[in-house]
């Protein structure tokens, strides 16, 4: 089944209207000038319709702030009837569901940004991505932003696990949805891939702020710098198309609605224009899981080829040739190296600043180890002529 390209979304240049009460929702004139001159992300649809509340939610005591937001968003709900559910799978932010009906048909998710995550995530860009994906039918409703987070619609369905995403009927749906997102246009601009910009920024943070306290299990900064240069030199030559990517498609970011027979992706903090092969390779790495990482679960070649065939045929609307599938297979596995490196750097930064209960240092070491383990084999993959 072909996935038709999405029409470009009309936009105005850096659509944001200044609201003095909430600095998160504003751009200064200087920021607009800088963004216009060297924009890593094409602007999305106008954001004027999204309320921004001057409310800060305490990370350690979310409920009072969440209820203040609910009074604004659902004034007809009686406070004593509001139920809550805490989601604890996230390792970047804290998430609370607020609802009154048992079936959670009308449910507001309150997401509180993790400490210091502005070092890792462009929050204005996240909101642009949210609205861009919503405009193309790929995201839930965004209800509001507040000083340190946002509220949005709860998507019905179940978050998948590593055991689910390797099932053929489900990975076909995932491939189709990714193909759909990858067809979102860049509003007439020629987008740059975010990968190198973000990776260099993360590396600079690690080098300048964190390196003196690094564990002996982490490669030395000089080694990381060499590997980053090697990645950029080799992967930039692969001619992977730059498309709109999710960039963080771990299992729990995939919601399966069995009633409607589709999947949707959630959490757009890292979304943006990037290499097609990075998005797919990153997802394949996530077959290993996050809390209990096991790279024995990395998809076998046969599974990858079938997944990639579904993806290409959805994107093209015609049958994919064996050469096309093999070419994408080589690109994807090479870019999966960059995914290991990217999230290892990310984890080192999180280890320094995050208050989430997760062993980020251990995770960084696991990702670096896997990078160096598979690098020789992946580097030897030849691109089909």
UniProtKB/Swiss-Prot annotation:
Its EC number is 2.7.1.82. It holds the Pfam family Choline_kinase. One of its GO terms (molecular function) is ATP binding. It catalyses: ethanolamine + ATP = phosphoethanolamine + ADP + H(+). Keywords: ATP-binding, Kinase, Lipid biosynthesis, Lipid metabolism, Nucleotide-binding, Phospholipid biosynthesis, Phospholipid metabolism, Transferase. InterPro entries: Kinase-like_dom_sf. GO terms for cellular component: cytoplasm. Pathway: Phospholipid metabolism; phosphatidylethanolamine biosynthesis; phosphatidylethanolamine from ethanolamine: step 1/3. One of its GO terms (biological process) is phosphatidylethanolamine biosynthetic process. Belongs to the choline/ethanolamine kinase family. Highly specific for ethanolamine phosphorylation. Does not have choline kinase activity. This is Ethanolamine kinase 2. It comes from Rattus norvegicus (Rat).
């Amino acid at each position: 089944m072909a996935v038709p390209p999405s029409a470009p979304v009309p936009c105005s240049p850096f659509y944001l209207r200044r609201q003095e009460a909430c600095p998160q929702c504003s751009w200064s004139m200087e920021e607009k000038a800088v963004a216009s001159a060297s924009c890593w992300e094409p602007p999305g649809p106008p954001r004027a319709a999204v309320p921004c509340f001057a409310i800060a939610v305490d990370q350690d005591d979310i409920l009072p702030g969440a209820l203040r937001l609910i009074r604004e968003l659902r004034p007809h709900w009686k406070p004593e009837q509001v139920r809550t559910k805490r989601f604890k799978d996230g390792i970047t932010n804290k998430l609370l569901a607020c609802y009154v009906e048992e079936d959670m048909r009308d449910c507001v998710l309150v997401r509180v940004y993790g400490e210091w995550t502005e070092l890792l995530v462009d929050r204005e860009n996240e909101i642009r991505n949210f609205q861009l994906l919503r405009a193309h039918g790929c995201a839930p409703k965004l209800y509001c932003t507040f000083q340190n987070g946002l509220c949005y619609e709860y998507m019905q369905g179940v978050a998948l696990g590593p055991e689910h995403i390797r099932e053929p009927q489900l990975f076909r749906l995932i491939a189709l949805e990714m193909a759909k997102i990858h067809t979102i246009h860049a509003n007439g601009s020629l987008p740059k891939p975010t990968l190198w910009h973000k990776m260099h920024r993360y590396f600079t943070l690690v080098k300048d702020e964190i390196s003196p306290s690094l564990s002996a299990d982490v490669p030395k900064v000089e080694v990381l710098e060499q590997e980053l240069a090697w990645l950029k030199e080799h992967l930039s030559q692969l001619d992977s198309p730059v498309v709109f990517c999710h960039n963080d498609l771990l299992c729990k970011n995939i919601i399966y609605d069995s009633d409607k027979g589709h999947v949707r992706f959630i959490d757009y903090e890292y979304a943006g224009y990037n290499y097609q092969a990075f998005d797919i390779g990153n997802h394949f790495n996530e077959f290993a899981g996050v809390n209990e990482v096991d790279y024995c679960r990395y998809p076998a070649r046969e599974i990858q080829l079938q997944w990639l065939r579904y993806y290409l045929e959805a994107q093209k609307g015609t049958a994919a040739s064996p050469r096309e599938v093999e070419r994408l297979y080589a690109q994807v596995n090479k870019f999966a190296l960059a995914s290991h490196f990217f999230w290892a750097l990310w984890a080192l930064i999180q280890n320094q600043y995050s208050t989430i209960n997760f062993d980020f240092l251990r995770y960084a070491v696991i990702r670096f180890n896997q990078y160096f383990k598979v690098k020789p084999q992946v580097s030897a993959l030849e691109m089909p002529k």
